[in-house]
Regions:
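N-terminal accessory regions of nucleic-acid-interacting proteins
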Residues: 1-23
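Two-metal-ion RNase H-like nuclease active-site motif
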Residues: 24-33
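Short His-Asn-centered micro-motif
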Residues: 28, 88-91
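Short glycine/serine/proline-enriched coil/turn segments at secondary-structure junctions
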Residues: 34-38
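Metal-dependent phosphoesterase core characteristic of DEDDh/y 3'-5' exonuclease domains
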Residues: 40-57, 91-155
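Nucleic-acid-processing active sites and adjacent nucleic-acid-binding tracks
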Residues: 57-77
Length: 155
């Protein structure tokens, strides 16, 4: 398993702090070997959070052997405890159910009910007509907004 952490600065990101006050926000994304929660596994979890100076820390847990899914899930669950708000893109439909199901396989309980949730996909979906031909896939929204990618960065 590889764990990597780095910091970046960006003035182009929307400042969600204004919407959430003093609450600590964790942005996260997962990468999986497929869409089946039962047959496929999570090989990467990326998480980002804002520092007091406006910079962002990014941490990634990568299962480079195909045998460390349990390790990255345990590390993510422990890390998650430090936050109040969980932000993602289509996480309510994909990422969170996938994490919960894969955690249950190993006896790891993820209780997302205690967090305030922010799913960017659900926020922009009502405005789909404004995006014309876009499918609202994460990559297309990133290109459209010309922003720092919402997902994880390559190791």
């Amino acid at each position: 398993m590889i764990s990597k952490e780095y910091t970046f600065y960006s003035k182009r990101l929307y400042d969600f702090d204004e919407d959430y006050g003093d609450k600590k926000i964790l942005y996260f994304d997962i990468e999986t070997t497929g869409f089946s929660r039962e047959n496929n596994h999570i090989y990467l979890i990326g998480a980002a959070y804002k520092n007091a100076d406006g910079s962002f820390n990014i941490i990634q847990w990568f299962d480079d052997t195909g045998k460390d899914e349990i390790k990255i899930l345990l590390l993510f669950r422990e890390f998650l405890k430090n936050f109040d708000v969980v932000a993602d893109y289509n996480g309510n439909s994909f990422d969170i159910p996938f994490v919960i199901q894969r955690g249950l396989k190993y006896g790891i309980n993820f209780n997302f009910d205690k967090y305030e949730m922010f799913d960017l996909y659900k926020k922009i979906r009502p405005y789909k007509k404004l995006f014309k031909t876009l499918s609202l896939k994460q990559k297309q929204i990133e290109i459209f907004l010309k922003r720092v990618p919402l997902g994880v960065h390559a190791l």
